Amino acid sequence: VAVKCATITPNAARMTEYQLKEMWKSPNGTIRAILDGTVFRKPIIVKGIEPYVSNWKKPITIARHAYGDIYKNTELTVPAGATAELLITKADGSQERALIHEFKDAGIVQGVHNLDSSIRSFARACFNFALDQKEDIWFATKDTISKKYDHRFKDIFAEIYETEYQSKFEKAGIEYFYTLIDDAVARVIRSEGGFIWACKNYDGDVMSDMVATAFGSLGMMTSVLVSPEGTYEYEAAHGTVTRHYYKYLKGEITSTNSIATLFAWTGALRKRGELDGNTPLCSFADKLEQAAIQTIEDGIMTGDLYRLSTLPNKRSVDTETFLKEIALHLDALL
């Protein structure tokens, strides 16, 4: 069980700012690839923060595949007149070659990959999580366009569902639903929530932010990476909140929503308690979450939530005051 802080993925500007030797790949992508896990992100719902999508009544959990796609890509800039090809060299030395593009003008090319084993782990993690939560699970790709890459995801999910989970789902009264990613987006917006939406890595990255913001704030989103071996890594779903950090460095007071970071710690403490049979630790995690929610529902919140809240009596406080108020609520519960 681990807790991870927010990290940057450097671009050209960050390379200069932090004097980096190279444009390092995403730290999150690297960790996810090593653990071969699935990221589950779920909004934290509180009274007074109404979803932008008025018909959403229940949380929507995003299950994000944590391996491959653009997060483990290889990409190059291509000069005019060059030819880009996809080359597979097999174990026996034979090769398979496919033309990507003949570049009349300068351009770019990118190679992405995935593994059947990782997709299978992802599928099983999603189906197990759906059974545990007793919620329907949706999965979507663009298999009509990506007839090898995305279609592989669709086929593996269907195979594992039909051979390992269909009878369990029927017994639990839940269902597995597959559709195209664009259709899924439309269906999600029309739904009332209350299901798990399984997404490929990039889709999950984008849609988890959309769902979190539509429910209120990216600062109100839990995130846990679960590996097939039973490793749990909790983190805030948002990034490093760079603008607030720069203000902090200048000595300015910020009003930074720390709920997602707080819930990363409570999630990890609860899981550690569950694994160790430590009931008091689980209880402490539950009460800390309860204290955080009560603080917001009592009208004490950070600036981002203040702008969203429909509570009649509310006030915006700075980061330190917000945490102190949560501590006071926690003391009352302990």
Where are these regions (language model features)?
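N-terminal glycine-rich phosphate/adenylate-binding segment common to multiple enzyme folds
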Residues: 1-95, 202, 206
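Flexible, glycine/charged-enriched surface loops at secondary-structure junctions
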Residues: 133-141, 165-178, 273-285, 295-308
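Glycine-rich phosphate/diphosphate-binding loop of Rossmann-like nucleotide-binding domains
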Residues: 86-179
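Glycine-rich phosphate/nucleotide-binding loop
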Residues: 188-287, 291-297
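Short acidic, glycine/serine/threonine-rich loops at helix termini
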Residues: 13-18, 72-77, 148-153, 188-191, ...
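Short coil/turn connectors at secondary-structure junctions
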Residues: 26, 40, 49, 55-59, ...
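Phosphate-binding loop/pocket of nucleotide- and phosphate-handling active sites
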Residues: 303, 307-334
